[in-house]
Each structure stands twice: as structure tokens, then as C-alpha cells.
Amino acid sequence: RDYYASRGLGDVYKRQAPRLNGARLPSDWEAQDYPPRAGREAHGPNWDTVADYRACLEAVRPATNLILFAGHNTLRKGVMGDAPRAATPDDIATMTRNLEQALDEGAWGMSTGLVYHPGVHSRPEEVLALATACARRGGFYATHMRSEGDHLLEAIDEVLALVRATGIRAQISHLKTSGRANWHKLPEALARIEAARAEGLRLHSDRYPYLSAGTDLDIVLPDWASAGGNAAILRNLEDPAARRRIIAALDA
């Protein structure tokens, strides 16, 4: 009871795009979350779309199977740049069209990183609209939720509401309880997911089996310090007053 059996797995979730330099990919690359469209991460020397990227992959002949996801942050950047604001109806309509193109060209679904910029500025209705379009085409939804710490349970509830509304198949990526003050929330987090599955929702989650974590350093900065992307971060780090505010927030 309360134990799970699984085949041996490597790291089945990779965000980085493989370098398309003619080499076979490393054997630990089991899955690939690659954004398809119009943002900095989406572009390369030979591709702008999922169709272009697939053609490049086929030329490289990778050694592993790859699954492509349309990244919400890249969809957002392609329409809104790094603007720290809510999306307008026109913004959402354009993102939806770009997502549908990516899905039609072979993306397996949509992924979100709602603790990262610019996704941190999105409202639930924006993500819901895109997930609805994804569900219509049979796509999958993989999410880095809005919180893995102080608001973990509320973030899980947002995912559950989205899955109930759309019927989409979903995965909570890297389920964790970040921060000692939140460690006690794990049983309740798992209970909510199990209850949703018993209800009939097609929802799963994964946890990596190690204690450390790795991500972009800007994740530890207060939202105001990183709003506007890397250029804004550098300006704030160079400004003595802003730097003192950042240090105070990190020490709090």
C-alpha cells in the first residue's frame, strides 16, 4: 500500500533542445519539451516551427524517441514578448492559433512553466483557453505549476479545475514541496491527486528521486526583479538600491 512499482527510467523529462549538429543524441534523452513557435527558445538556424524542427531531427536521426511539446512561455513570448501583464483576448486568440499549428505539425501537447517568466504573469483563464484548444486536438498537458511551495495546494487545485473543465490528459511535472515549512503538505497533495484520479480525471504526476533541484537562477528572485526578462534582471542587479531590495527579499 502507498508504494509504486515502475520500470527503470532515466530522466524522462528534458526541457533542452538537442544540438542539431549531426551527432546522435545521448542515450539519457528520453523525452523532449521543445517550444515550437516565435520565441527565442523556438528559433534556430534552420527552424521556426515544429514542422521545420521535425525535419531537422529526421536528418540527424536521433538515437532515442523524442516527444515534442509546445511551450506556453514561448507561445506567449511570440505574441507578447516579456510583457509582465495579463493577455488580452486578441493575444489569447493568436496564441491559440500558433498552438493549433504546432499540434497539427506534430507537437504532442502543451507544457507550462507558470513559475517562470513570462508565464508567471498569465491568468488561469489564459491557460484554460489554450488547454481547451489542446484538448480539442487530443493533446496532452504537462505543467510546472504556479507554486511548489507556499501555495502548492492551491496550484494543484488550479490544475484539477483545468482538467475537469477540458477533459485533457495532464501531468504535474516534478511534484515537490519546496521549503521546510511546506514539507508537511505532501500527503495532502498526493491525496488530492489520487482523489481526482478516482473521480475519473486523467491526471498523473512525477517526482524526481533526488534531493537537489536544478533550474534557472532567476527563479529565486522576487517577481518584480525579473519582470521584463534578462535585460530587466541585469538592470536591477546593477542598480545598488534594487540590489539591496533583492538581497533583503532573499534573506526574508
Task: Please annotate each region the language model reported.
Residues 19-27, 77-83, 122-124, 153-157, ...:
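Short acidic, glycine/serine/threonine-rich loops at helix termini
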Residues 47, 86-93, 117-122, 149-153, ...:
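Active-site glycine- and acidic-residue-rich loops that bind
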Residues 186-252:
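Hard-cation-handling environments
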Residues 11-108, 201-203:
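Divalent-metal coordination cores built from histidine and acidic residues
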Residues 71-73, 113-117, 146-148, 175-178, ...:
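Active-site beta-loop-alpha junctions enriched in small/polar residues
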Residues 1-13:
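Single conserved hydrophobic/aromatic residue that forms the stacking wall/gate
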Residues 101, 107-159:
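Divalent metal-binding pocket/active-site signature
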Residues 52-55, 97, 125-136, 157-161, ...:
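Alpha-helical scaffolding segments of alpha/beta enzyme cores, especially the outer helices
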